[in-house]
Each structure stands twice: as structure tokens, then as C-alpha cells.
Amino acid sequence: MNLWSPTTLKEILARHNLTLSHGLGQHFLTDFGILAKIVEKAEITKDDAVLEIGPGAGVLTRLLAQAAKYVVAIEIDKKLLPVLAETTGDLGNVVVVNADAREINFDRVMAEQTGGEFGFEGKPYLIVANLPYYATSPLIFKVFEEGYKVSSMTLMMQKEVAERITAKPGSKIYGSLSVACQYFSEPRIVLKVPRTVFFPPPEVESAVVRFTLKENSLTSEERLKFFQIVRAAFATRRKTIAKSLSGALNLKRNYVEEVLLKVGIKPDLRAEQIPPESFYRLSQEVVGGKW
């Protein structure tokens, strides 16, 4: 089944009386070379389980199924389920789950669909996805905030978001997403993708980012505090870190400055000048004492 042909895709969608939803960010990748590159960059083995978010018509899904032991595909659009049944129904290692990926527990779903082999107390799994642009940041934050048992992510996204994720301290586009991604993983842009290889073409250029997740033992409380501090710090970018934190968290300025100095952060710096590791040290000081 030549799913990477726009003509074939149009025929399948027409057969099911479907039109693509702009609101759900439905843009199907139809270039076989780029699809194969995504699978290659994901470094999938026959012992791996892959969580795919937004399989669409199953174009990438079929290639993932060739490389992995299991593929669990999460699709929000009920109208696409008959399409996926047609395009992936012959694959014995693919399960399609109709759900909003922003609202489900990834570890639980993976454990349920792999007989407990992956997720929770099982082995780590991979995430590979051509993400809907509107959900990119929420889904990435979700993985890091929840501490899911994910070893790597290979994600197609808007090029602008990819550049924010990999931006370094001091850059105008370095922000809370940069801090989260670079503290919990090692993100790299591994592929740039033109808009012309999608059906229908989006209005922006895309890029594929490969995230290699770092091992850490943060508790739920520590993760919560880390993200609370990072978001508060970037809430008012033009202010100093001391002003931002004292204002957003309703704390006395002199107390905030004292804590910042204790962990080696100058109170007159702005959030965009502070590396991820410094935010971690700050969150640890807060967890260990009073905030």
C-alpha cells in the first residue's frame, strides 16, 4: 500500500468521506525518503515499543511497525479510525487507541497495550510522532512533568519551536521550553523538512528533533517545584529573576535574593541568561527548605 502517494491518500480519504481538519493540525507527510529518515533517526530496534501520537492515516505507522516490536498509536479524531483500520489493520503489532494524548497517562496505556512489558514497572519506550503543531509544547512538557518511562523522543514539529527547544542561554528565544527540554534531555535538530512534502502543505517549515532523555530521580514534588519556578521566572521576561520570582510567587524580594545567591544565581540576571542546571539547583533549595 503506497500511502506516501498524495493520490492514494486522497482516494482513501474520499472513500471514507473525509476532509482534513485544520483545527486538529492534520497535515500528512507523504515523502517516503523523509519518513524513512525519521525512523532511522529514532534508532528503533526489534526489541522496542513505540508510542506514536497523531498517526493520521497511518503513513508513518507502517514504517514504525516494520522497525519495532510494538506500536501504540494515539489518535484523537474518531473519523480517522476507519482509515487507520484500512491502512494498518493487517499489522499484528499495531494498536490504535482513540484518545486525546494530552489527557491520558502514557505509561498506563503502554503497559495495558503491551501486557505490562513496557511502561510503569516495565521497560522504557520510545515516542515517535509527527505532532500537531497546536499540541507540541503541551505534549513535550507533559512527558517531562509526569516523568514517564520514555528513553527517547523523535518528533516532527514547527521549525520555530525546534529552534526554541535547542536555543542556548542568552538567546532571545531561550525560554521555559528550552530549559525543560535541555534539563531533562539532550535535544538535537536532526532533520529540516520543507512544507511541500505534506498533504495538505502547512503554512510553516518543519523540523525533526531527537530527544535523548537523561536519567534522573526527581520525585513528583521536585518536578512540580522545578516547573513552577521555571514558569514563574519566564512569566515576565524583561524583569530580573528576583523580581519575576517574588512577583509571580508572592514572596518578599530580599528572601528571594538570598535564596538565589545561595545557589549561585545573581539576582539581577534575567531568566533567559540562566542555564537549566541553575534552575534545578534553585528548585532543590526550595524543596529542601521553605519557599
From Swiss-Prot:
Enzyme class, broadest EC rank: transferase
Organism: Carboxydothermus hydrogenoformans (strain ATCC BAA-161 / DSM 6008 / Z-2901)
Function description: Specifically dimethylates two adjacent adenosines (A1518 and A1519) in the loop of a conserved hairpin near the 3'-end of 16S rRNA in the 30S particle. May play a critical role in biogenesis of 30S subunits.
Catalytic activity: adenosine(1518)/adenosine(1519) in 16S rRNA + 4 S-adenosyl-L-methionine = N(6)-dimethyladenosine(1518)/N(6)-dimethyladenosine(1519) in 16S rRNA + 4 S-adenosyl-L-homocysteine + 4 H(+)
Keywords: Cytoplasm, Methyltransferase, RNA-binding, rRNA processing, S-adenosyl-L-methionine, Transferase
GO MF term list: 16S rRNA (adenine(1518)-N(6)/adenine(1519)-N(6))-dimethyltransferase activity; RNA binding
Protein's cellular compartments: Cytoplasm
Positions of S-adenosyl-L-methionine binding: H27, L29, G54, E75, D100, N130
Pfam family, one: RrnaAD
UniProt KW Nucleotidyltransferase keyword: no
Major subcellular site: cytoplasm
Name under which the protein is recorded: Ribosomal RNA small subunit methyltransferase A
Record-level GO cellular component terms: cytosol
